[in-house]
Amino acid sequence: MSRVGNRVLVVPAGVTVDISASNFVSVTGKLGKLERAFSPKVKITLQDNTLTTQRLNEEKATKQLHGTTNALLANMLKGVSEGFQINLEIKGVGYKAELKGNKLVVAAGYSHLVTLDIPSNVEVKVPKPVEISVKGIDKQAVGAFAAVVREIRKPNPYSGKGISYKGEKIRRKEGKTASK
């Protein structure tokens, strides 16, 4: 029994949801529009500003899709009404980031600058050279781009230098000790 799939999703004010016969869902809100095709094994219904999902059979794959479909719909509703934001912080001497047009340029201790193209559905801001803010309405796109930025230089467990999510607890290790 999927507890996530049985959640009733309340459609926020100012958000419209359109469901086609082929389970193609379009969600429009003040921040934009998201569209996604869902499996026909899960029935999506809209009644009185609430979205519900129901499985059409009890197969294992359908049970797995039930909770996933409900979670994806919840993320779509939140994305078009509030949006998603991930903040990253850069630690290290000489490590910094800047925006140049539609590109994010990161100096992360390499012999060269790392340049990333910013996707069209993601907005990136650099309030300080050591802070990066990734915003957007699509949770998957925001998380994927933030992960790509973090992958440039993961936090070092010995020194703590690198790019990490804001508030991320980095597991620190002790260095080598001198022998006696």
From Swiss-Prot:
<dbReference type="Pfam" id="PF00347">
    <property type="entry name" value="Ribosomal_L6"/>
</dbReference>
<comment type="similarity">
    <text>Belongs to the universal ribosomal protein uL6 family.</text>
</comment>
<comment type="subunit">
    <text>Part of the 50S ribosomal subunit.</text>
</comment>
<dbReference type="InterPro" id="IPR000702">
    <property type="entry name" value="Ribosomal_uL6-like"/>
</dbReference>
<dbReference type="InterPro" id="IPR036789">
    <property type="entry name" value="Ribosomal_uL6-like_a/b-dom_sf"/>
</dbReference>
<keyword id="KW-0694">RNA-binding</keyword>
<dbReference type="GO" id="GO:0003735">
    <property type="term" value="F:structural constituent of ribosome"/>
</dbReference>
<comment type="function">
    <text>This protein binds to the 23S rRNA, and is important in its secondary structure. It is located near the subunit interface in the base of the L7/L12 stalk, and near the tRNA binding site of the peptidyltransferase center.</text>
</comment>
<keyword id="KW-0699">rRNA-binding</keyword>
<dbReference type="GO" id="GO:0002181">
    <property type="term" value="P:cytoplasmic translation"/>
</dbReference>
<dbReference type="GO" id="GO:0022625">
    <property type="term" value="C:cytosolic large ribosomal subunit"/>
</dbReference>
<dbReference type="InterPro" id="IPR019906">
    <property type="entry name" value="Ribosomal_uL6_bac-type"/>
</dbReference>
<keyword id="KW-0689">Ribosomal protein</keyword>
<protein>
    <recommendedName>
        <fullName>Large ribosomal subunit protein uL6</fullName>
    </recommendedName>
</protein>
<keyword id="KW-0687">Ribonucleoprotein</keyword>
<dbReference type="InterPro" id="IPR020040">
    <property type="entry name" value="Ribosomal_uL6_a/b-dom"/>
</dbReference>
<feature type="region of interest" description="Disordered">
    <location>
        <begin position="158"/>
        <end position="180"/>
    </location>
</feature>
<dbReference type="GO" id="GO:0019843">
    <property type="term" value="F:rRNA binding"/>
</dbReference>
